[in-house]
Amino acid sequence: MSELIIGVDPGTIVAGYAIIAVEQRYQLRPYSYGAIRLSSDMPLPMRYKTLFEQLSGVLDDTQPNAMVLETQFVNKNPQSTMKLAMARGIVLLAAAQRDILIFEYAPNVAKKAVVGKGHASKRQVQVMVSKILNVPEVLHPSNEDIADAFALAICHTHVARSPLCGVR
């Protein structure tokens, strides 16, 4: 039986998610992926509600074993940081309600796991995710969030199987 890992790249306009199946001998296979697209015309509370409902549906349908997110960061605009933090909270709540294990990695750790360098561009992440999992759809510019979500899930599989890590 394979283990399912969901990576989530939360956002207030687009939230990408990607589930990989970890097969025997750590072979990775794309299981399910997509983007929850939220209209900027919607009031923010309605976007959070929609994010929660749609992500909850994905989690209920797929029942992943673990969820992976980027660690919180602070950007130059405090208002944007707060909005993103609330979206992260919605994602964390959806996972916690279902007793899904939650793991967090810094963006540069996820990039290094997939591309080999921590300061890789979004495009480099898309290209490597496409090659690793044979998912050409992530190369489309509108699917950056899905590629980031895949990168987080891939990163977790690398860290979790490391004998130097106490995650497993």
From Swiss-Prot:
Where on this chain does Mg(2+) 1 bind?
Answer: 9, 145
The cellular location(s) given in this protein's UniProt record come to: Cytoplasm
Give the cofactor note text.
Binds 2 Mg(2+) ion per subunit.
| Residues annotated as catalytic | 9, 70, 145
Q: What cofactor does this protein call for?
A: Mg(2+)
**Pfam families of this UniProt entry?**
RuvC (PF02075)
Please indicate which superkingdom the organism of origin belongs to.
Answer: Bacteria
BP GO terms, sorted: DNA recombination; DNA repair
Entry's Gene Ontology molecular function annotations: crossover junction DNA endonuclease activity; DNA binding; magnesium ion binding
Q: What is its EC number?
A: 3.1.21.10
Listed InterPro entries? RNaseH-like_sf, RNaseH_sf, X-over_junc_endoDNase_Mg_BS, X-over_junc_endoDNase_RuvC
EC class, as a word, reads hydrolase
Q: State a GO cellular component annotated for this protein.
A: Holliday junction resolvase complex
Q: Which residues bind Mg(2+) 2?
A: 70
Q: Which keywords appear in this protein's UniProt record, sorted alphabetically?
A: Cytoplasm, DNA damage, DNA recombination, DNA repair, DNA-binding, Endonuclease, Hydrolase, Magnesium, Metal-binding, Nuclease
Q: Which reaction does it catalyse?
A: Endonucleolytic cleavage at a junction such as a reciprocal single-stranded crossover between two homologous DNA duplexes (Holliday junction)
Q: Does the keyword DNA damage apply?
A: yes
Q: What is its main location?
A: cytoplasm
* Family the entry assigns: Belongs to the RuvC family.
Which purpose does this protein serve, as stated in its record? The RuvA-RuvB-RuvC complex processes Holliday junction (HJ) DNA during genetic recombination and DNA repair. Endonuclease that resolves HJ intermediates. Cleaves cruciform DNA by making single-stranded nicks across the HJ at symmetrical positions within the homologous arms, yielding a 5'-phosphate and a 3'-hydroxyl group; requires a central core of homology in the junction. The consensus cleavage sequence is 5'-(A/T)TT(C/G)-3'. Cleavage occurs on the 3'-side of the TT dinucleotide at the point of strand exchange.
Subunit composition and interactions? Homodimer which binds Holliday junction (HJ) DNA. The HJ becomes 2-fold symmetrical on binding to RuvC with unstacked arms; it has a different conformation from HJ DNA in complex with RuvA. In the full resolvosome a probable DNA-RuvA(4)-RuvB(12)-RuvC(2) complex forms which resolves the HJ.
The record's listing under NCBIfam families reads: ruvC (TIGR00228)
Q: What is this protein called?
A: Crossover junction endodeoxyribonuclease RuvC
Species in which this protein is naturally found: Chlamydia pneumoniae
Q: What is the lineage of its organism?
A: Bacteria, Pseudomonadati, Chlamydiota, Chlamydiia, Chlamydiales
